[in-house]
Every structure is written in structure tokens, then in C-alpha cells.
A protein has these predicted regions:
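Short N-terminal edge-element motif at the start of the domain
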Residues: 77-121
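Short aromatic loop motif centered on NTY/YTY
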Residues: 105-107, 112-121, 135, 155-222
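Beta-propeller fold detector
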Residues: 88-96, 155-167, 232-235
């Protein structure tokens, strides 16, 4: 009887979480319809994050949720104003079942993998975004990827990440998966126009490729922004 009671308590908590996510989405949609989404005050909304790009033209609003079946859900709004007098363009991305993003390929509102974006750096033709994701309990993911904006089309990913100094092999984004017990830091250095971040290694050489056992090894890597990004450099 006690186990049955605990089960129903768990179901209630999960259903409440799903309902809260739906209410949050409806409330944000309502606010954006009633006022300028570029300036809308969302500070009273719990768990809803908002970041502005370094050029002040792109606002990103996002939050996440754990669904009743254990999957991770992500909600994201890109709000773009090329000029201050322009009406903002709003594009909503949702992922009801987050998945590990692929290094190669592009994503849009119809096939997005799901993450929280916490920094946007203006580059030629768009932005370079930093994202954070949980798609399973045993690992965490950090992402560096381009956002291209063309009218009302918002596309994530572009083949600008050089895998080698030759520049012959390119990827669409940088994806770093590591242990859920570890912390990986990525910072942007505007003067050098580069991202600097922890180098990840398995806790044991025999665990190579099993990213849930990866973590910082107290060395650092860098990706420099130029015509293309990279190649990866140890610093």
C-alpha cells in the first residue's frame, strides 16, 4: 500500500511538472503577443532564462522541463531585431524529446535537438551560440554552434568548424559530452576572438569513447573565430 501511495505521489509530481511547462509556454506566448517580445519583462517567471547577444540585436528566451516519461524537454525563442526601429522577428524552437546533437548537419524549428543557450556572440552572417544540454541522466553536453538568420529563417549549424589544420574536413558545430558529476567551462575572449574551454578526457584510458566518464583534465583547448572556426588548439 505504501509503494502504491508513493507511485501516485510521483505521478502527481510529474503531471504537475508537465502542466507547469505547458502553462509557462502559454504565458510566454501571451506576453509576446501583448507587448514587444524584445523588451518584455519575464523576470517574475520562474525557471525562464533570457540572454542578449553582445551586439544587442538578438534576445534568446528559454527553459527546460523533465517530462512524465523521463525525457527532457526544451523551449526556446529567438527574437531578432536588425535595427532598433524594426519589428522583431520571433522564432520558437521546441524539443519534446531532447537528443544528442550531431557534429554534422543543420537544425531548424522542425528538427531541433533541444538545449539552453546562454551566450550569443555576433559574427559575420549571424551568431555563435553557447548551449548547455541534458538529454540523459548520466551525462551533460556543451555546444558551440552558429545561428544563421535570413529573414524569418533561423538555421543552426554551418560547416565552418575545421577538424584539422588542412581545413579539408569541417563540422557544423562543436559538441562536448561529459560526466554529470563534472563541470566544463567555456568562455569567450573577445580580444583574441576565441572560445577557451576545458579539455575533456576519460577518467581511465580504457573508457575512451564512453563520454559519461569524461571530465576536465586541467588542460585547455581553444577555437578561434575567423573565416572558419578552429582547428582545435591545445593551449
Amino acid at each position: 500500500m505504501r509503494k502504491l501511495k508513493q507511485y501516485f505521489v510521483l505521478l502527481l509530481l510529474l503531471s504537475s511538472s508537465v502542466a507547469a511547462a505547458d502553462v509557462t509556454e502559454q504565458k510566454v506566448d501571451s506576453i509576446f503577443k501583448a507587448t514587444d517580445p524584445f523588451k518584455a519583462d519575464l523576470s517574475t517567471m520562474q525557471n525562464v532564462g533570457s540572454v542578449m547577444s553582445d551586439d544587442g540585436k538578438l534576445r534568446i528566451v528559454s527553459w527546460n522541463n523533465r517530462s512524465e516519461n523521463g525525457t527532457f524537454e526544451y523551449y526556446n525563442y529567438f527574437i531578432y531585431k536588425k535595427r532598433s526601429k524594426d519589428k522583431p522577428t520571433v522564432k520558437k524552437f521546441t524539443a519534446k524529446n531532447a537528443a544528442l546533437p550531431k557534429n554534422k548537419g543543420k537544425y531548424n524549428a522542425n528538427n531541433w535537438y533541444g538545449c539552453l543557450y546562454y551566450k550569443a556572440v555576433a559574427v559575420k552572417g549571424g551568431y555563435m551560440l553557447l548551449g548547455y544540454q541534458t538529454y540523459r541522466d548520466i551525462s551533460r553536453v556543451k555546444i558551440i554552434e552558429p545561428l544563421n538568420i535570413n529573414g524569418e529563417r533561423f538555421t543552426l549549424g554551418d560547416d565552418v568548424f575545421e577538424k584539422a589544420a588542412s581545413g579539408k574536413k569541417k563540422e557544423s558545430r562543436a559538441v562536448f559530452e561529459y560526466s554529470n558529476n563534472a563541470v566544463m567551462n567555456i568562455s569567450y575572449e573577445p580580444k583574441e576572438k576565441r572560445f577557451v574551454f576545458d579539455h575533456l578526457s576519460p577518467e581511465n584510458p580504457n573508457l575512451k569513447g564512453m563520454f559519461q566518464y569524461y571530465g576536465p583534465d586541467f588542460t585547455y583547448d581553444a577555437l578561434t573565430l575567423k573565416k572558419n572556426v578552429g582547428p582545435l588548439q591545445r593551449i
